[in-house]
Amino acid sequence: MTIHGAVIIEQGVTFAIIAVKQSVTMYTARMVQTRHELAQFFPNMPIILMSQDNSGTPHYY
């Protein structure tokens, strides 16, 4: 599995932003499942999922 993302520390808050396919962010159940699967790689931090629409505009969840 290849994960494309970053761990960011902003104003003392550490979180992860992970790029996923748009199909992952279309359904709440898939977002929850994906966050759960990624939690082992990013313990004890919030995980933000980022996908892009057809025009390349990023959306964060």
Regions found by a protein language model. Give the residues of each.
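A cross-kingdom feature that marks ATP-driven nucleic-acid transaction machinery
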Residues: 1-61
